Amino acid sequence: MKRKHLKRVVAGAFAAVMARSGISFPQANVHAEEKGNELRLWYDEPTSQGTNILGAGSGYDTDEKNRWQQHTLPIGNGDMGANVYGEIASEHLTFNEKTLWTGGPSESRKDYMGGNSTEKGQDGASLKNIQKLFAEGKTSEATAACNNLLVGISNGYGAYQPWGDIYFDYKDITEKNATEYQRDLDLKTAISTVSFKEDGTQYTREFFMSHDDDVLVARLEAKGSEKLNLDVRFPSKQGGKTVAEGNDTLKLCGALTDNQMKYASYLTVKADNGSVTGSGDKLTVKDASAVTVYLSAATDYKNAFYNEDKTEDYYYRTGETDEALAKRVKETVDKAVEKGYKEVKATHLEDYQELFNRVSLNIGQTVSEKTTDDLLKTYKDGSASEPEKRQLENMLFQYGRYLTIASSREDSQLPSNLQGVWNSLTNPPWSSDYHMNVNLQMNYWPTYSTNLSECALPLIDYVDSLREPGRVTAKVYAGVESKDGEANGFMAHTQNTPFGWTCPGWAFSWGWSPAAVPWILQNCWEYYEFTGDTEFMEENIYPMLKEEATFYNQILTEDKDGKLVSSPSYSPEHGPYTAGNTYEHTLIWQLYEDAAKAAEVLGQDTELAAKWKENQSKLKGPIEIGDDGQIKEWYEETTLDSMKPQGADPAGHRHLSHMLGLFPGDLIAQKEEWLQAAKVSMDYRTDNSTGWGMGQRINTWARLGEGNKAHELIQNLFKGGIYPNLWDTHAPFQIDGNFGYTSGVSEMLLQSNMGYLNLLPAIPDVWADGSVDGLIARGNFEVDMDWAKTSLTKAEILSKNGGECEIGYPGIAKAKIVDSKGAEVTVEKVSEDRIKFNTTKGETYTMTEIPERPVKAPANASAIYKDNTAIVTFDAVANAEKYVVYASTDGTTYNKVGEVEGTEYKAEDFAEGTTYKVAAVVEGKEGEKTSKITPEQLAVTNKIDDRDSRIEYSSGWGNWGPQEGQYEKTEKYSNTVGDTAELYFYGTGVRVIGMKIQTAGHLIYM
């Protein structure tokens, strides 16, 4: 990648400017908490005393491990991370550096080649045979061959590793005597503090991770009669030896046993008005009023496929000696020590706040007096006030931005992984790796729209680095070869590591996913869409798009109808193996779309782009509608239940793979028919998910314009997917869900994927009054908005690149638009709800006098019928006085047939073929009508079990596992008061038959 790494240069230049200009620095005392700070996570007990909630999940099988993921507070600078426990007598931090990985090339794996198996792949012969079997209709044989041949190996995969632990063992503090305890993480400053009183002395600690100086800083203070007397320890999690070097420094250097990766770290302690001495593996502080600790770390990892003279591949090392690596790290610490605490902190705040302060959100939040864990608890049980709920929702939105800045900076060597940059386990769940069948993509969904585009650069770097090893995989498994200087195509699949692991997984059923590359390339292409940086796109993004589109030109095959299919295909992570499916074809369609657009912008590869468009038009599907009005997940699908795999139920599956053309893609929104079909599929998939699955659902419903539905999922996420430290849980902790939530909130407020700025497209009723500043739309437009009663009252648009701006909002053609000088802007009216106008780079345009938004249509409208009676049901609309019902016999002309005050309409003169629409009336004004409601014939069913897709479960329900002997995972259960199971039926009653477990639960029929 042709991009300058500016981190160290900028830091040095900024320090020099400050020295000359006489900028004043903060006082030397630690960060004081801001009163009335709605973006402060805070707690009144240490991690060791917090209450664990929800499940622990894989890997966190002890109370101590579980507390780390549920209660500790994360800080980071993109390359390093730490988690603060906030203990009283023995403070504890876990420490990470993002490149410390096992796996990859090593002395014991001299033939390492990224997991590829030439024996299995046979240079594409296996794939071609499988494609032939599918074409001949020999599905069983093809499936068996997929399982046997389109797989990689597992040896050398490795895992992200914890570096070590930092302890501050106080000699004069007794935990039981501490009072007025607080610990916090201030999202406005990226500083975590711990404070308490004991024996008349105020003890305060401050922790932050400086990006520009590349150090973790801890500032410990005592104000009162007592001084600081403590030991500082820094034990390794990798078997390395920590030794005191001189009187004030701990050195922890070594090499991983698995792959001989070198690592080096230095921790230096400076005391105010006291002494520091070193002995053995610790430093001892005596009689200090304050202590400052500086820590930095690095490895000899380098994301380079070849060594410098290209004599070795799968290299991934700098080639540094132990001494050179140690010297590099020691110099980093020494420079920070020389600058001193005040200047390092000032630099940190300047750097962090320039990014974080770009976006602010007001959705009616307050500043609750409750601790964050209590606030979460009351949100879950419903006792929190509405402004308190808004505080938590806003905090989680900004937390996602904070975690982005902390785990992925413009010069980070690697992107954020499954856990960002934080990990406490040597064998973390899923290796804390890079999963590319939703997780890595979701990590970067909010990056552009929430004004942090530079934080996406490590992802683009990383995807680019997959090309060299991916060409090996393309040759082994697809028979596509790139000779020296050629870029004929590369492959990568579900999971990746920092060591060019691009092979399929060691099981086809989760590990085969070549379309993961087109999917992750969407994230890369969006950098250009949002920034408009054509030069960067030409040098760094278009080559990847071009190579991958060229790859698909070579591996797509024709089916019997002459349509192009990607064979074999698999919809993550369930269902049959087929010749093409919606997941793969939607992503290939988007790849061709973006590659052709890039070629057009650059004026390059005209003939090649024409071929891409031709192949795009010949793709099977990509979107097909099934017999139940749903978007098919598999092209062989008829009704929703027709492809149900044995032992699984797609109705509640966590993945939404067939919805990628809706979000994050652009395809489904091109046709209203497809949008309505997407709603059918989403309803069928249910809201029953956790973690990233809930995050994906929030984004997808937001794209459908269903703000209240998206907010319902937000509520479910808080109730079943967030730990006390606001980390998302799958379970266990995975950071993607945090980013998915932040992206979802952004999508509810602003969308731009369809070529125009769609303002407040999915604003929920509970965010009735509010504002947002700093969101970014494609075309590099920065958007500020104010709204009242969910209606837009003012919008300011900063055109950062110039060019045409198109706006969508109900009635926007009647709005007044002026530039920064107050001059009225000439606009072109596309429709009553759409306008466009030319903009000047750097100019701000203000819209006022915007018509009030029409009352929203009732959500979740549906209907059933039996004989001549139809029942139409829908959700209530806030403050609705009544509802107007319309009917049509031709699906085009709708006439009013009745009014109801409740949320059910009964038609006793129903004729088959009749469809309905419903509108709410608020303050005498009739609102928008629902989409067409087609009644479904009531099926007479004597008995159904809990697997029936017509039963809608709230998010708290789960399935008993086979170890409990509960009917092979088919029995539903819930331990949460208030959980519901809904079944709409026509009849005289319903009887529920279940296990009798004393008085463990009961049902209330409504």
At which residue positions do the language-model features occur?
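Aromatic-residue-lined binding/catalytic grooves and analogous aromatic/hydrophobic interfacial grooves
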Residues: 33-508, 528, 549, 585, ...
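Beta-strand-rich modules
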Residues: 907-925
